[in-house]
Amino acid sequence: MAIVVRVDVEVVSLTTNLEKIPKTPENTRKHPKMVKNPQTKMSLKTDLTPANPRPEPCRRFSVAPMMDWTDRHCRHFLRLLSRHTLLYTEMVTTGALLHGDTDRFLRYDDTQHPLALQLGGSNPADLAACAKIAERYAYDEVNLNVGCPSDRVQNNMIGACLMGHPALVADCVKAMRDAVSIPVTVKHRIGINGRDSYAQLCDFVGQVREAGCRSFTVHARIAILEGLSPKENRDIPPLRYDVAAQLKKDFPELEIVLNGGIKTLADCQAHLQTFDGVMLGREAYHNPYLLAEVDQQLFGSTAPVITRSEALEQLRPYIARHVAEGGTMHHVTRHVLGLALGFPGARKFRQMLSVDIHKHPDPLQVLDQAALIIEGR
């Protein structure tokens, strides 16, 4: 009960602080955006791959970095559904890249472009070193996480707590920009408890802009850093699209991508009247077939929309290769469970790919049986 009372106070504070939104000087300079098609070959990227300069990725529609979800297998599946969506890795900490198995964290197949690496860290030198590694792996963008509210990352000065240290974030961005030629972007909240006024948000964005960042993905909620789980921080603080919209008005020269609570392509089209791009998180994972019409509705593609059964059929060779290399089918199929969402047999589909697949001597046969449930759809 004490937590609920404290949260209510924080939310009221947010509303009060943001009721009157001051304006900052406007700058009408715009930055061009390009749509880039992914490569079609299936080579696996490693740090032995030379840097491959690419046009800046288009951020009109992207899938958010999500821990335990947007791994390389998930991204391969999502790329089958949409050629133009910008995909993000899970957040990878600087310590993991510099002192762990770098290739395990960063390798991917070349079909996944356009692809961005999200980094977690707050040491400018370490972030610069990791950005160089990302460039060697031919990532199209490096993104700094300034939005994750979990206690675990806060203890290492990672994530949303950095909104309380805009000068440090600016130093981190500058160090990365000085180290690489690929774009460096930031994903952040509209504030944190104790630093949730619009003036403070503008101060944060302004300082990071001066460090050279030109693209900001804004999760339109504050983060409450004590007493709430990451899941609660995605739901309890209210969405404030108006604050993000004001930010775009006051910083027209910056690319502002909206994140938070977006569930349909109709929502996307509406928000694109105000913002430069939209980013979907949980909805894109739980209902992945939503991506199947992104290219047509948001990028003007005239290619036919892929069916659910076609997507699963195209995923089969990837799964077979992964299994042949010693992996398990569940590494891949766990990301496909939402493909039958809304159809009769959806529960059976999920059971076959999450339970039955472990019991059968030929798991690919179970995959083929599951495919019959969505055949022609």
Question: What is each PLM-predicted segment?
Answer:
Residues 63, 78, 90, 117, ...:
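Conserved, mostly hydrophobic/aromatic
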Residues 22-25, 29-32:
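Compositionally biased, intrinsically disordered low-complexity segments enriched in Pro/Arg/Gln/His
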